[in-house]
Amino acid sequence: MNASPAAAPARSLAAVLAFAALIVCVAMGIRHTFGLFLTPMSMEHQWNREVYSFALALQNLMWGATQPFAGFLADRFGAKRVLWGASAMYALGLLGMAYASTGTGLAATAGVLIGASQSGCTYSVVFAALGALVPEARRAWAMGVVAAAGSFGQFLMIPVASQLIGGLGWFGTLLVFSAAALLIMPLGSALTRGLVAAAASRGQT
């Protein structure tokens, strides 16, 4: 009889939850700070509100539209590769957003690139990894914990972003966030090491 997926000890489960929660906290936390950049960026580049609003609307559209694709890639190539690719795209999108001087550039970076990257480093891919790592009896609870971490990231990053913008300006803050997005790479590696162990465990039972 096969064991349930990832019948891991409590310590391993705690580590899995910590890595998954941190990934979602970083990704969702940064995502929910973008409204703070509207006024300073619009004033700097002499944009009307519609330019920035369109980029954020496009970001939301891309996030939703690419989530099934991110899930497919995670199934086909593994969650680690998707998380790494999404992390790189997120960082590149934030960097490009900092240097965007036209509405088209903003739409391409803050809209298309960041929106697509978020589908690969938020709930769809992370929850898929949890489904393979966490025993079925605790799976719903684990997903609730990670979802709460995303909400905490939103709560935490708003005042952090506000302070950074006040001290470093919007440009410097986007550079800091670009570097922060790269943290998803090592966190993703740490999370998905458990996927390899779980697969090996299932193969031996």
Question: What annotation goes with each model-predicted range?
Answer:
Residues A10-T33:
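Pair of pore-lining "gating" transmembrane helices in MFS-fold secondary transporters
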Residues L36-G64:
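Extracellular/periplasmic helix-loop-helix junction of adjacent transmembrane segments
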Residues S87, A91-L94, T109-A110, S178-M185:
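A generic transmembrane-helix signature of 12-TM secondary carrier transporters
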